[in-house]
Amino acid sequence: ACFDPRELTSFYPRGSKELLSVFTKFQPGDTMEWFESRNVPLKIEKDNRVFPVSDSSQSIINAMTKEVLGKKFEIKTQISVSEIINQDNNYLVKTKQGDFLADIIIYSTGSAPKSLKMIEKLGHKMIEPVPSLFTFNIKDDLLKDLPGTSFENAEIQIPSLKTAESGPLLITHWGLSGPAVLKISAWEARTLAELKYQFEIEVNFISIPISEAENLLKTFKTQNPKKSIGQSKIFNVTNRFWNKVLEICNINPEKQIANISAKELNAILEALCRKKMQVTGKSIY
């Protein structure tokens, strides 16, 4: 959780200026106090995410429903809004089940074109929405046959945009996913849409500088000269991924590490720390 309004806005890819005044009035600390005062104890995870101690979303739903019904609000579901009309400083909300008159409306549109058009008719200028929080479609020999392989911490760069994000990473059937990918897709949502989701990324699977990785490899080579490269546990990656790295580098996993050439070592380092891959599209996560 973050309790400083200005710092909090820095975590939002868009709308930080507009959110500052909102967070000055009501921020995560207020939200936590609101729930805990209504008998929903909360906990802060290591990554700063906040969850109910119960680990059940029903705890949150129950608290909010009880509060709304206690204040005599009505909750109407399965009702589709067909039109909103400005009427004498009020809003007439038209539905098939009847009309509602309101002085204030909060409309959570999502990306539904129909909803956006209704808001636009009320005089609001709409900015064309683009997808955010998506995964990358990639076809690369290094990822082939490895869906489900995860990395505790990796770094993804988009060199052409001079941007990077780090965090857990997951190989999927269609490419790459996980927090590192989702974060960079959120921050660069508009630019990636302009690129039609065709761009190059550079991945550091072990999230340490290539010079440090080189030192670790050379030290291991000196200390374990007779060990086969395929059985050498040097970095925090799975055995399957390590052997896939050797495969794309055309290195026999049975080869003694003492016999690994400088060229082969460099190929391993490039695959681990500076792997370039072409993104060819996006998918939902």
Feature names for model-found ranges:
Residues V81, V93, D99-A112, M118-E120, ...:
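Short hydrophobic core segments
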Residues L8-R14, E18-K43, S54-E74:
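N-terminal Rossmann-like dinucleotide/flavin-binding domain of flavoprotein oxidoreductases
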Residues I75-Y91:
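A conserved short coil-to-beta-strand element within the FAD-binding core of flavoproteins
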Residues L20-Q27, K46-K66, S108-G110, K114, ...:
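Short beta-strand to alpha-helix junction loop
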Residues K71-K76, G98-L101, M277:
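Glycine-rich phosphate-binding loop signature in dinucleotide/nucleotide-binding domains
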Residues F3-E7, P13, T24, D30-N48, ...:
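Residue-level recognition of phosphate/Mg2+-coordinating polar/acidic sites
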Residues I104-K144:
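Glycine-rich loop(s) and the adjacent beta-strand/alpha-helix scaffold that form part
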Residues I75-I79, T95, E128-V130:
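Short loop/edge segments at beta-strand edges and connector loops
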